[in-house]
A protein has these predicted regions:
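Extracytoplasmic ligand-binding site segments that recognize negatively charged/polar headgroups
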Residues: 1-105, 109-119
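Ligand-binding "clamshell"
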Residues: 17-21, 136-147
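Short, hydrophobic alpha-helical packing/hinge segments within bilobed ligand-binding/sensory domains
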Residues: 48, 114-117, 133, 171, ...
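Sec-exported extracytoplasmic/periplasmic mature domains
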Residues: 53-57, 78-82, 102, 119, ...
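Periplasmic-binding protein-like
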Residues: 94-100, 140-163
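A ligand-binding cleft/hinge motif common to bilobed small-molecule-binding domains
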Residues: 119, 125-142
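Mature extracytoplasmic/periplasmic domains
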Residues: 153, 157, 162-223
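Conserved C-terminal helix/tail region of periplasmic/extracytoplasmic solute-binding proteins
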Residues: 218-248
Length: 248
């Protein structure tokens, strides 16, 4: 990071990705939230715990564990139980997911599936990444996207330099360009085309009233990240537990 002039302008959560996990610099970020049809439900959803309400039986879709936010969903389940996921390797989380199962219609892999289920009335609630918002909103104009007040989980996209890179200095220059105020401002302004990227440069003035602005503020204020140095060694076990709990 010391070689990047624009690194100093990154939001703290983005800096932590490089510092804590050893990845390359983050250049964009996504966050997980809840999209729902208030009219179909007759009530609002404000927290992750609301997903476990019996009134939502047979109304929810959540991402498969191999999805970008699959592991984050496991973390949400552990949070619901009030257990630090690292203290039991996810045991409480899968107990919570078993309790959630009656409410789950499907575990999905693509946002297009969520859009189709909303438009057909098959579901009224889904856990999605912010990047899927536009796709689902087009299929279900009345749908509302919320980030729970208690917080959420963010996923950072990073740029890494390969071990045998022959142009390291040039690679750093390109990364610095990608993190610049000009570039991050330009890419964040494309939301109307469904391409808006949430920036990590804290100096970017994102457009008001957009999903990009919403995510940008949430990540700065109350987003956590998944520690993949903890998760990856457990993924095979978790995948088996996931299938036994939700797909058997």
């Amino acid at each position: 990071m010391s070689k990047l002039e624009n690194g100093k302008d990154m939001i703290e959560a983005a800096k932590a990705v490089n510092k804590d996990n050893g990845y390359g610099p983050a250049y964009t970020v996504n966050a997980m939230g809840i999209i729902y049809d208030k009219e179909a439900l007759g009530f609002e959803i404000n927290e992750w715990a609301d997903l476990w309400k019996p009134e939502l039986k047979g109304k929810i879709a959540i991402p498969v564990i191999s999805n970008t936010f699959g592991p984050a969903m496991v973390h949400v389940a552990s949070d619901y139980k009030g257990v630090d996921i690292k203290s039991d390797d996810g045991k409480a989380a899968f107990e919570a997911l078993a309790e959630l199962r009656p409410n789950i219609v499907k575990t999905y892999s693509k946002s297009a599936e969520v859009a189709n289920m909303f438009s057909s009335g098959e579901i009224a609630v889904a856990v999605i990444g912010d990047y899927a918002f536009n796709t689902v909103k087009k299929a279900s104009p009345d749908a509302t996207f919320v980030y729970p007040a208690s917080g959420t989980y963010a996923s950072f996209n990073t740029i890494d330099i390969t071990k045998n890179c022959k142009n390291v200095d040039l690679a750093y220059k390109w990364i610095d360009y990608r993190l610049s105020l000009e570039t991050e401002t330009r890419t964040s302004s494309l939301e109307n085309n469904g391409l808006g990227e949430v920036p990590v440069n804290g100096k970017v003035e994102v457009a008001e009233g957009t999903n990009v602005e919403n995510t940008f503020n949430v990540v700065r204020e109350r987003a956590k990240t998944v520690d993949y140095t903890f998760v990856l060694p457990l993924m095979e076990t978790w995948t088996n537990q996931w299938n036994q709990t939700l797909n058997s």
